[in-house]
Amino acid sequence: MHIMFIPSWYSNVRNKVHGSFFKEQASELQKAGVKVTVAYNEVWPLTMIGKIHEEKGLNYNIEDGLKTYRYKNYNYIPKNALMFKVFNKRMEKLYKEIVKKEGPIDIIHAQSSLWGGISATYISEKYNIPLVITEHSSVERGPYVKKSYVPFIR
């Protein structure tokens, strides 16, 4: 079984413990014999322009034993529901690269609806792959949910 693991937030060079639970869960699945590939849309806020000196776009590394594909770029349309369309296209690039390099995906496991779960749903529906979302907050009552986001969450 091959799981594409989509975290909504994840460790990075500026915050090594961000999403540590997600990484631990993926590692435990891998230790249990499951093939796990992490697909992370690493979104940078516009306030970080000039402060981040990493290459934008798709990259691959083995991080703590996990095959990790990242798509790194800024959120050019923050706090606007259109950003989800951009996120979905980035996730699709990650998905296609993972399938090309690692083989077909049997199941997608997203951690939290915002933001990874939205893109996971897009990929799941477009490519007919079963999806599991582990939620970590009350999405409908959460402080980050705008009315314009609701159609993407449901």
Model-derived features with residue positions:
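A conserved catalytic-core segment of Leloir-type glycosyltransferases
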Residues: 38-102
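A short, flexible beta-alpha/helix-coil linker loop
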Residues: 9-12, 74-78, 138-141
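N-terminal subdomain of nucleotide-sugar transferases
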Residues: 1-67
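A cross-domain feature marking catalytic cores of carbohydrate-active enzymes
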Residues: 40, 110-112, 133-135
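Nucleotide-sugar donor phosphate/pyrophosphate-binding loop at the beta->alpha transition
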Residues: 17, 127-132, 138-154
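Short amphipathic alpha-helical segments and helix-helix/interface helices
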Residues: 23-27, 121, 150-154
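Soluble or luminal CAZymes and related metallo-dependent hydrolases
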Residues: 17, 21, 83-91, 152
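An aromatic- and histidine-rich active-site surface loop
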Residues: 84-88, 105-127
